[in-house]
Design a protein with these regions (language model features):
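Transmembrane-helix signature of 12-pass secondary carriers
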Residues: 2-444
């Protein structure tokens, strides 16, 4: 939005215009670290049941389909959770939403650690999913609303690299505590909810959200804090603005202007998420079908997680240079190629080679997509827009373990199962082609 002069002589300036001239400061780094580790916690929580699945299955004597249902329970909780937190984050703010989500997750995750039956564990994991959805909805929206325009794409992709760190923590906690019980594994994981205090101390509220709420002074406080006083604008003499939509309205997402965006991003989310999660959720079991022991499988997954980091870093540099769409299409396409090759692996060396390529490009694409999705919507509906995409992801997350569990229960081969999963990546590429480019554009 460009600058305007009102009849009263007050200059109106879009918040996005302020961020075109804002330098990257230490305050951005502090806020970024707080939000980054919130995303790490999210990945940790999603992976912990998968990594402890063999212990839980042995304790409750679970068949593959029932274990798949347990793995998917947290994602079923995230379906209503994302929709709920999408409205909350647009109404009460990004910061409060993230703090409340982390705190409530910690309590519910701790409750799941004392489960004495399969169904108690299932429902407490479901409730944990509802609670953790607030972090999921707010992380990328919150971070990109704090960043200068020139740094937004690259820095937000770095945020996505918290996923493999969360995976590695889940592997480490499970490996260290496997000899005790899965109860201790979940109990230790629940302590991550205390990170809410770090978010409270380290990150300001989003200026975009504050302006949309009419909180001019709160927005200006955040801008002064983030810029460390190094703005060319005199904030005391301007009125900040954002594009106006009905705040937190799901209906706005399905009106003529935004419906094509909502339909396309939902389609990308379903296919892309299936192409990743259907494989990740059953990777320990799939590796056992190829003859790997549990320690060998943990090592395979850990090494694969390490390969994700250069994928994120490469995608971060490339998206800032060439934009979202080109890099997203190229990376998902190559991930699909490596996925089909992984399905045909006959030796351990081939499995490592093709899986490294698969996760390098897949996770690089996820970093771009997590950044891009929030940029597609204006401020007043960014939270609910992002939450719809995440809800579709969680539907995909919930269905994928069930379907793959069904296939494995019928002794479907490794090759056919992984090829089926990789087909969804092709669908994600097709839908991505029709989305608009947002690199270098201000948020509205």
């Amino acid at each position: 939005m460009t600058s305007l002069q009102t009849s009263a002589g007050t200059r109106q300036v879009g918040v996005g215009e302020i961020f075109t001239q804002m330098p990257l400061t230490r305050e951005h780094w502090k806020a970024g670290i707080a939000i980054f580790f919130s995303f790490v916690i999210e990945a940790w929580e999603m992976m912990i049941i998968i990594m402890a699945s063999d212990v839980i299955a042995a304790d409750f004597k679970l068949a593959p389909t029932k274990l798949g249902s347990l793995i998917g329970s947290i994602f079923l909780g995230m379906i209503p959770g994302c929709l709920l937190w999408g409205k909350i984050t647009d109404y009460v703010g990004r910061k409060k939403s993230m703090m409340a989500s982390l705190a409530s997750y910690g309590v519910l995750s701790l409750a799941s650690s004392i489960s004495f039956s399969y169904w108690m564990l299932w429902w407490t994991r479901f409730a944990s999913g509802v609670a953790l959805s607030g972090v999921l909805v707010s992380s990328f929206v919150y971070f990109e609303e704090l960043l200068p325009v020139k740094s937004r794409g690259r820095a937000t992709v770095y945020l996505a690299s918290g996923w493999p760190i969360g995976m590695l923590i889940a592997i480490g906690v499970t490996h260290a505590l496997r000899a005790t019980s899965w109860h201790w594994i979940l109990a230790v994981s629940s302590l991550a909810g205390l990170w809410a205090f770090v978010v409270w101390a380290a990150a300001p509220e989003s200026p975009y959200w504050a302006v949309g709420e009419g909180e001019q002074e709160l927005a200006k406080q955040s801008l002064r804090r983030l810029s460390q006083g190094r703005l060319t604008f005199d904030l005391d003499r301007i009125e900040l603005t954002v594009d106006e939509y009905k705040r937190g309205s799901f209906r706005e997402l399905f009106h003529r202007q935004l419906f094509p965006v909502t339909a396309l991003q939902s389609s990308v989310n379903f296919c892309f998420c299936w192409g990743y999660w259907a494989l990740a959720s059953w990777m320990p079991i799939l590796l056992s079908k190829k003859g790997l022991s549990t320690p060998q499988g943990d090592e395979f997954i850990a090494l694969t997680a390490l390969v994700m980091f250069p994928g994120y870093m490469t995608a971060s540099w490339l998206t800032a240079r060439y934009g979202r769409k080109k890099i997203m299409v190229i990376f998902i396409s190559l991930a699909a190629v490596f996925g089909f090759a992984f399905a045909q692996s006959t030796t351990l060396g081939q499995m490592y080679l093709w899986s490294f390529g698969l996760y390098f490009f897949n996770q690089g694409a996820w970093g771009v997509w997590d950044t891009w999705m929030g940029e597609l919507y204006p401020t007043d509906v960014r939270g609910v827009g992002y939450s719809v995409g995440l809800t579709v992801q969680r539907i995909s997350n919930s269905l994928a373990p069930l379907v793959i569990g069904f296939l494995l229960a019928r002794n479907t081969s490794f090759s056919l199962t992984v090829s089926f999963i990789s087909t969804f990546l092709v669908g994600a590429v097709i839908f991505t082609l029709f989305l608009k480019e947002t690199e270098g554009e201000v948020l509205h």
